[in-house]
């Protein structure tokens, strides 16, 4: 298990062992407890970004489907019905994509935030990898929000604290990589003898522009997304389970 701190305070978790589910879920819970105050009761909205009809883009929706949603139970029946004295109020939404709704995701979430007034928004999305080594092997947690679609050049309005007026945590996993990155990584060892500027010039000449719009995903993406989404949802459930005294 490898942990590293990346720019914008993004925490990455990489693992090469297939039997990592429980360990990674615990790490996700620990990191979430570090970036948000879960010592007191919070109202938390979890947003599953992406298109559930496209496997590589369905990470967010699958995470929300596996969450322990509690807000409605607490509102209707009170904490006693759940046998708890304290509990976070968890709600979830799968907003779909603009082609399905005709609305920006940010518009939908802004409306929900204005109506339900959560303390924190957690947004989960599939990402585009900048390296083939990170594909399906890195979980990024950031406290600076998330920009839906930006990894594949489909720039939408970001889900950030500035836009929503509440703290936004972003969680992402790179599930696709563009063809140009595959070519770049494949040729990297061959070009080690060249200076960095020469490498860049050579690759720009070699890589056709259309390769930057062609995205590739592993053949086992169905099973991988199912596994990753369950691992993340269990991490969230663990993080939300206990509240300090």
Residues of each region from the PLM?
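Gly/Ser/Thr-rich loops at beta-strand to alpha-helix junctions
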Residues: 49-59, 99, 126-130
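Proline-aspartate-enriched helix->loop->beta-strand connector
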Residues: 113, 118-119
């Amino acid at each position: 298990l490898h942990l590293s701190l990346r720019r914008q305070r993004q925490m990455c978790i990489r693992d090469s062992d297939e039997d990592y589910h429980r360990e990674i879920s615990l790490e996700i819970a620990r990191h979430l407890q570090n970036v948000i105050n879960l010592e007191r009761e919070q109202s938390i909205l979890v947003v599953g970004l992406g298109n559930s009809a496209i496997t590589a883009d369905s990470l967010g929706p699958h995470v929300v489907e596996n969450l322990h949603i509690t807000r409605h139970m607490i509102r209707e029946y009170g904490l006693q019905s759940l046998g708890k004295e304290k509990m976070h109020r968890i709600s979830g939404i799968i907003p779909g994509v603009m082609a399905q709704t005709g609305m920006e995701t940010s518009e939908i979430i802004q409306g929900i935030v204005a109506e339900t007034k959560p303390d924190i928004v957690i947004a989960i999305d599939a990402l585009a990898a900048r390296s083939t080594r990170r594909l399906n092997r890195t979980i990024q947690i950031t406290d600076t929000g998330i920009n839906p679609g930006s990894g594949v050049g489909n720039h939408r309005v970001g889900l950030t604290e500035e836009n929503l007026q509440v703290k936004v945590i972003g969680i992402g996993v790179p599930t696709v990589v563009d063809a140009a990155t595959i070519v770049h990584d494949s040729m990297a060892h061959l070009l080690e003898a060249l200076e960095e500027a020469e490498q860049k010039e050579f690759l720009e000449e070699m890589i056709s522009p259309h390769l930057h719009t062609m995205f590739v995903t592993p053949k086992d993406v169905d099973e991988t997304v199912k596994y990753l989404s369950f691992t993340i949802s269990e991490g969230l459930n663990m993080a939300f389970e206990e509240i300090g005294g």
